[in-house]
Amino acid sequence: MVEQTVVREHIKARVMSLVRSAEPSSYRNPKLYTLNENGNNNGVSSAQIFDPDRSKNPCLTDDSYPSQSYEKYFLDSPTDEFVQHPIGSGASVSSFGSLDSFPYQSRPVLGCSMEFQLPLDSTSTSSTRLLGDYQAVSYSPSMDVVEEFDDEQMRSKIQELERALLGDEDDKMVGIDNLMEIDSEWSYQNESEQHQDSPKESSSADSNSHVSSKEVVSQATPKQILISCARALSEGKLEEALSMVNELRQIVSIQGDPSQRIAAYMVEGLAARMAASGKFIYRALKCKEPPSDERLAAMQVLFEVCPCFKFGFLAANGAILEAIKGEEEVHIIDFDINQGNQYMTLIRSIAELPGKRPRLRLTGIDDPESVQRSIGGLRIIGLRLEQLAEDNGVSFKFKAMPSKTSIVSPSTLGCKPGETLIVNFAFQLHHMPDESVTTVNQRDELLHMVKSLNPKLVTVVEQDVNTNTSPFFPRFIEAYEYYSAVFESLDMTLPRESQERMNVERQCLARDIVNIVACEGEERIERYEAAGKWRARMMMAGFNPKPMSAKVTNNIQNLIKQQYCNKYKLKEEMGELHFCWEEKSLIVASAWR
């Protein structure tokens, strides 16, 4: 107990920012990577398809993130804004620490100049409870963390029933052998333990063992140390995990190769998990958003340089265009239009339709809990879309409906008789808590409510990975494999020292990674599910699959062949389109009726 207290105090002292910019010494390999294997970059931009005339779009600029203004924005954030833990009166720890205390010899660029009142104050009354496969500190004085027995029993029964219906057997904790193929990369911890535990017959043998152990550590890759650290943490070995966190911070860089970049973000997720500060970091990263144009540009860059996300939008738009062909009045309901990128493309596509064009009405749910934009930001996005529609001769009206997604009802959506109704879910459903979080299954309730609207078409675009119900360690493995593919794909499209690339990784990827790794329960917002689970949920809600047409599939396939390297792949399974980096499925798009 004393040892764990010391470790926790050490963790508290080392909590720092999730995101940093590296000094020149952190550069590992400044080699520039092109988009395709031929070594040229003339096929880099997808702007011709996604945004044919970038110069006419007031939301985009060629230099979306001038370094000076970007750093000034974050470093000038007010210091009187705080996110404090509700319990404890211990010393506040700056989320970014002093400039001299940063690992990787780095300096803070991203942050909110906030301080966290960490839940590791030695003066606080705490108890340890088991959450999944790890031990976390819970605070009972003013936090209702213990539920009534009857509620817990009811939740268990509901989960058991829905698990049987949804086929959750794959979510059970399994050995690492069943998660992935074991190779030498994953043997770091075992080799280290063997060296440490081997009998010492003489002082010479002791010396050799010590040298051998050092060699193992020095030769270990960031991936090996990350996995060993996550395993140690899942087993409650805090001191071992902390040691590996410190080791990782010396060898990773947000400007290094993909393995170093993803390790830089995931190690901070592990540190936040040990410090129970994941939810505070998550809040801090959305406490003060950049100016609207910059945020929009960051999302736009992500869709251009990691095109699997854009392919998902294009597939949904293709299905929508086919569904509204010949219709006069079309009403699209979108529960999170993000930054409106999908509808920029859709409006231009409608403008190119032959004959009479439909009149389009778009209702966007402006959820105050959304992590994609500031409250009220949807109105600004709507104005941009209306201007774009006017410029392209498309009849278009936009309505931002401020409401929590969980309480939206048919009566509030303003559906009218005679109009063709389309519902679009793009990277939104995974934010809704399901039966594994609460007895009120908001994820399935939303789908049933949408079914009651009798839409002509429902489109779903989601990440194809399970970070929802799996326990911590297998979830960590899945998240690493998934985001490794994302970071590797970015390595083919933007140079490693690119300011745009670092902004994309910070604003669009890092926050999700930390939330997946560090948080549990209702605090874990990023709850992706695999394609099969989404399929089961849609069918349980009463929807029938509508396979993507050959035209939609062929159009995207041709786009990939013409403008992207052959590592981007499109696979069709059960009428759904899977967009992959090499053999790893990243995004899945499907249509339902």
Curated annotation (Swiss-Prot):
Coiled-coil segments: none
Bias (Polar residues) ranges: 35-48
Biological process according to GO: regulation of DNA-templated transcription
SAW as annotated region, ranges: 518-593
Stretches for region Leucine repeat II (LRII): 380-411
Localization (cell): Nucleus
Region (Disordered): 29-61, 188-216
GO terms for cellular component: nucleus
Low complexity biased stretches: 202-211
PFYRE: annotated span: 421-515
Region called Leucine repeat I (LRI), residue ranges: 220-280
Domain (GRAS) ranges: 213-593
Motif VHIID per record, residues: 330-334
VHIID: annotated segments: 299-364
Tissue: Expressed in seedlings, roots, shoots, leaves, flowers and siliques.
InterPro entries: TF_GRAS
Keyword Nucleus attached: yes
GO molecular function: DNA-binding transcription factor activity; transcription cis-regulatory region binding
Entry keywords, A to Z: Nucleus, Transcription, Transcription regulation
Transmembrane segment boundaries: none
Biological role stated in the UniProt entry: Probable transcription factor involved in plant development.
Family: Belongs to the GRAS family.
Protein name: Scarecrow-like protein 1
Species: Arabidopsis thaliana
Lineage of origin: Eukaryota, Viridiplantae, Streptophyta, Embryophyta, Tracheophyta
Gene from which the chain derives: SCL1
